[in-house]
Design a protein with these regions (language model features):
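Sec-dependent N-terminal signal peptides
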Residues: 1-5
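Accessory terminal helices/loops
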Residues: 8-10, 181-265
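Metallo-beta-lactamase
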Residues: 11-18, 22-24, 90-139, 147-149, ...
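Conserved beta-strand hairpin/beta-sheet module of binuclear metal-dependent hydrolase folds
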Residues: 14-65, 144-156
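Active-site environment of divalent metal-dependent phosphoester hydrolases
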Residues: 37, 55-58, 78-85, 100-101, ...
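Active-site neighborhood of phospho(di)ester-bond hydrolases with catalytic His/Asp-centered motifs
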Residues: 50-53, 70-81, 93-95, 133-136, ...
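Active-site HxH/HxHxD metal-binding segment of metal-dependent hydrolases
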Residues: 55-124, 128, 160, 217-224
């Protein structure tokens, strides 16, 4: 069932659905078959699993082979590619604002949802993760801040090259813009250096400050009704409405719904 090995220098586990690699000390990245990502963060006393992927059989057992520490499970948002395997865990942390998505994506979950608050700190022993609410992609999207090490684990809050803001229920573009501005401030103040995104296999690297600043520019245009240069957006796996569009600058792109854009000012 499981294959635990050292493949190359970094891989510590691999099967048909997931590959687990050491990202940095006591931090592992889980790259799944459909290019989604989980992160396992270990402290001296406890560990945290950030997101649970789409489909990864016996995820709890895989995690248990890597760390024997008591585990907290956090989902950055309630989309099925990040909360698809919560069934393997008795308790899962989420933001209350994403409960609107539970009937659609997690109605069969038999465990207990615990609700994170802005500024809540998970103390793992010698390592802390702070919750920051960053709505936009979903109403309850959060990121986890490891300020001591300069790391942010962002789920889909800022995308992985492209961010989806057309997902229902849609938030105003200004909401995403405000989240990006807050992230920029954290990075400029030196609290965060690297943003580790929710679809790491597409990039194989962290997102820098320049990426967030580009997202700020694009979202500022859209929230003021400027769609010049936008194009229709389609996705091979998920059917998009005819109103789905994309606006890109460099390596950053916002996917949005044209009905959610105000008239140009």
């Amino acid at each position: 069932l499981f294959v635990c090995m050292a493949i190359g220098a970094q891989t510590v586990f691999k099967n048909e659905e997931v590959e687990v690699s050491l990202l940095k000390e006591k931090t592992w990245v889980f790259s799944t078959w459909d290019y989604t990502t989980m992160y396992l963060i270990e402290g001296e006393d406890k560990a945290v699993l950030i997101d649970t992927g789409t489909r990864c059989a016996d995820l709890d057992k895989i995690v248990g082979q890597i760390t024997g520490k008591p585990l907290e499970v956090i989902v950055t948002h309630m989309h099925p590619d990040h909360a698809g395997c919560i069934k393997y865990f008795d308790k899962v942390w989420m933001h209350r604002a994403d409960t609107v998505l539970v009937p659609q994506h997690a109605a069969d979950y038999q465990g207990e949802f615990l609700y994170m608050e802005e500024g809540q700190v998970f103390d793992l022993g010698g390592r802390k993760l702070e919750v920051a609410w960053m709505p936009g992609h979903t109403p309850g999207s959060v990121v986890l801040l490891d300020k001591a090490n300069g790391d942010c684990y962002s789920g889909d809050a800022f995308g992985s090259g492209e961010v989806w803001l057309q997902c229902v229920p849609m938030s105003p573009i200004a909401t995403f813009h405000e989240s990006c501005c807050r992230m920029e401030k954290l990075m400029k103040e030196g609290h965060i250096k690297d943003i580790w995104c929710g679809h790491y296999p597409y990039l194989k690297s962290s997102l820098p400050l320049a990426y967030i600043q580009t997202m700020i520019r694009i979202s500022h245009r859209l929230m003021n009704g400027d769609q010049e240069g936008s194009e229709p957006y389609s996705n091979y796996f998920i059917k998009m409405p005819p109103t789905a569009r994309k606006l890109a600058e460099g390596r950053a792109m916002i996917v949005y719904d044209s009905t959610n854009i105000p008239e140009a000012r």
